[in-house]
Regions:
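Aromatic-lined, polymer-binding surfaces characteristic
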Residues: 1-134, 139, 146
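Extended polysaccharide-engagement surfaces of secreted carbohydrate-active enzymes
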Residues: 89, 94-298
Length: 298
């Protein structure tokens, strides 16, 4: 963004640092990341940072040509999600730390290639996941590590819904955003500088208006994400203070890490507040409290 503002010595310094650190990243990722089921921290931000650094020095560093080929093909092969239904395998809390990657990387590729990377059906499913797993003013549906801390849709989540609404012309997401911002008008500002979730830079570049059309009240009262094993049932899309909701999860075989797999687990809510819900925290992925309480296994 400020390339023409840098003097020659500043450019040399930046190229030297990108070359040094980019080489470390590539040597760490190559023949590992593409074969790893879900290297969480890399996907959350390191891969996005490496991708942007790579293209920023393309034409200046010879290594960048190899890096760019790797980054692009890895994205096409493995992302946006590790499934096809649009739900997030690691649950609602860890979903939030992937949001900048899920928007900024495909938006960049779309701009330089002319191909719409958001045409992947996964993003339509992701829009439904955002809405059904945490309706306006509701606590999280309750799956994955740290889900108990996701109390109401925050600025990061609403910012993601805002971006999806504009990028895939999803009117349900647009209604979700309008509904929440009507009561919490400064919510997007609260996400500013969240290193994995702030989409302010995207909003400065994209001026597509929020679409108009069908609203949340037109959605079905139940939705299933079969590959992730998650389902939500509710009673009212118009009066959230009177909405009764039940969420269900039965993890697919092989769930790992922050997914903290569970079987036939359910949570119940009224007015966005949990009635029957998982309790507390987990010390490790397999401690007794994690297995019997945090995973909400019943």
């Amino acid at each position: 963004a400020f390339y023409d503002k840098l003097d020659a010595s500043q450019k040399r310094l930046l190229l030297k640092e990108v070359q040094k650190n980019g080489t470390k990243f590539f040597n760490r990722f190559n023949n590992h990341l593409e074969n790893h089921i879900a290297d969480n921290h890399v996907w959350q931000m390191a891969f996005r940072i490496f991708t942007m650094a790579t293209f920023s020095v393309y034409g200046d560093l010879p290594e960048a040509e190899v890096w760019a080929d790797y980054c692009y093909n890895l994205w096409v092969a493995r992302f946006p999600g590790l499934n096809q239904d649009g739900a997030w395998h690691n649950g609602d809390s860890y979903f939030h730390v992937n949001i900048r990657t899920l928007i900024e990387v495909p938006y960049f590729y779309s701009r330089i290639s002319g191909y719409d990377f958001f045409s992947d059906p996964w993003y339509e499913g992701s829009a439904m996941y955002v809405i059904y797993q945490q309706p306006p003013f509701s606590k999280s549906a309750g799956n994955g590590s740290s889900h108990q801390n996701v109390l109401q849709p925050n600025g990061v989540r609403v910012g993601y819904a805002d971006a999806l609404a504009r990028l895939i012309n999803n009117t349900y997401s647009a209604d979700y955003v309008r509904c929440i911002l009507q009561k919490e008008s400064d919510l997007l500002r609260k996400a500013f500088m969240a290193k994995t979730g702030d989409l302010s830079w995207f909003r400065l570049q994209n001026h597509t208006p929020l679409p108009e059309g069908r609203k949340m009240k037109d959605l079905p009262l139940a939705y299933v994400f079969p590959q992730t094993g998650v389902a939500t049932l509710m009673s009212d899309w118009e009066n959230f203070s009177r909405n009764a909701m039940l969420t269900f999860r039965s993890s697919p075989y092989g769930s790992t890490s922050h997914a903290i797999a569970n079987q036939n687990a359910f949570n119940t809510f009224f007015d966005g507040k949990p009635l029957f819900y998982s309790s507390g925290h987990h010390i490790s992925f397999t401690d007794e409290h994690s297995v019997y309480c945090h995973r909400s296994t019943r």
